[in-house]
């Protein structure tokens, strides 16, 4: 051991003392993620609010960690959640198992499942790390209507995927789908009121006044 060896060790220490620290002040200062970052999943919607997920379970089959659980159900004319024949009634992702590989995104045929930039998934409860459909669904934006409701962008599922994405939506000329539904309901109530009024006999010739 040379006499200068201790000074060499301190030289490394002193040289780093005057360098700018690289510690990130998290969570006060969060680093921006890459555009194609693999974060928390999101279930997307169509412009009218219907869900893109058709309950095919291809994402669950593609998951190498067996982290996705899907139960599909049939749509009806009264209860429609997606343009297709089926929708995802139950959708769960277990983030205790998920490795954020993105294979489920590649397997999805309708682009219903994408990955967001949200990476803050730590929790002290195992149950809270099993995300349900309500937690994964994208929030309703302006012009969207909460399902179940009829199809607003066409008469079949094909119309939803063949429409021009740059074309204006039907309700952009007027109001939102919910406003159209309210107007239709008000028109129906007004028509019923008019029919009821027609059935009431008018007081005049040939009618008796109540005593």
From Swiss-Prot:
GO cellular component term, pick one: plasma membrane
Comp. bias (Acidic residues): 179-191
Record-level Gene Ontology MF annotations: 4 iron, 4 sulfur cluster binding; iron ion binding; NADH:ubiquinone reductase (non-electrogenic) activity; quinone binding
Binding-site residues for [4Fe-4S] cluster 1, renumbered to this chain: 53, 56, 59, 108
Catalytic activity: a quinone + NADH + 5 H(+)(in) = a quinol + NAD(+) + 4 H(+)(out)
One Pfam family in the UniProt entry: Fer4_7
The 4Fe-4S ferredoxin-type domain, residue ranges: 43-73, 89-118
Obligatory cofactor(s): [4Fe-4S] cluster
EC numbers for this chain: 7.1.1.-
Entry keyword set: 4Fe-4S, Cell membrane, Iron, Iron-sulfur, Membrane, Metal-binding, NAD, Quinone, Repeat, Translocase, Ubiquinone
Cofactor note: Binds 2 [4Fe-4S] clusters per subunit.
Top-rank EC class of the record's enzyme: translocase
Cellular compartment(s): Cell membrane
Binding site for [4Fe-4S] cluster 2: 63, 98, 101, 104
Region (Disordered): 21-41, 141-211
GO annotation (BP), single: aerobic respiration
Superkingdom of origin organism: Bacteria
First-listed, main subcellular location of the protein, grouped into a coarse class: membrane
Membrane topology: Peripheral membrane protein
Ranges of biased composition (kind: Basic and acidic residues): 152-166, 192-211
Binding partners and assembly: NDH-1 is composed of 14 different subunits. Subunits NuoA, H, J, K, L, M, N constitute the membrane sector of the complex.
NCBIfam families named among the record's database cross-references: NuoI, PRK05888.1-3
Homology family: Belongs to the complex I 23 kDa subunit family.
Role this protein plays: NDH-1 shuttles electrons from NADH, via FMN and iron-sulfur (Fe-S) centers, to quinones in the respiratory chain. The immediate electron acceptor for the enzyme in this species is believed to be ubiquinone. Couples the redox reaction to proton translocation (for every two electrons transferred, four hydrogen ions are translocated across the cytoplasmic membrane), and thus conserves the redox energy in a proton gradient.
Protein name: NADH-quinone oxidoreductase subunit I
Organism: Parafrankia sp. (strain EAN1pec)
Gene that encodes it: nuoI
């Amino acid at each position: 051991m040379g006499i200068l060896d201790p000074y060499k060790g301190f030289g490394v220490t002193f040289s780093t003392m005057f360098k700018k620290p690289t510690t990130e002040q998290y969570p006060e200062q969060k680093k921006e993620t890459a555009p194609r970052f693999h974060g928390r999943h999101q279930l997307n919607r169509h412009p009218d609010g219907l869900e893109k997920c058709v309950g095919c379970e291809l994402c669950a089959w593609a998951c190498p960690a067996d982290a996705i659980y899907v139960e599909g159900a049939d749509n009806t004319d009264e209860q429609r959640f997606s343009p297709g024949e089926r929708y995802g009634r139950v959708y769960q992702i277990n983030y205790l198992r998920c490795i954020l590989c993105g294979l489920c995104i590649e397997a999805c045929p309708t682009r219903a499942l994408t990955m967001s930039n949200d990476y803050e998934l730590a929790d002290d409860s195992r149950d809270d790390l099993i995300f349900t459909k309500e937690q994964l669904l994208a929030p309703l934006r302006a012009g969207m209507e909460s399902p179940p409701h009829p199809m607003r962008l066409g008469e079949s599922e094909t119309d939803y995927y063949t429409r021009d994405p740059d074309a204006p939506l039907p309700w952009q000329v007027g109001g939102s789908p919910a406003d159209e539904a309210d107007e239709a309901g008000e028109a129906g109530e007004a028509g019923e009121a008019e029919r009821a009024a027609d059935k009431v006999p008018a007081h005049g010739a040939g009618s008796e006044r109540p005593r």
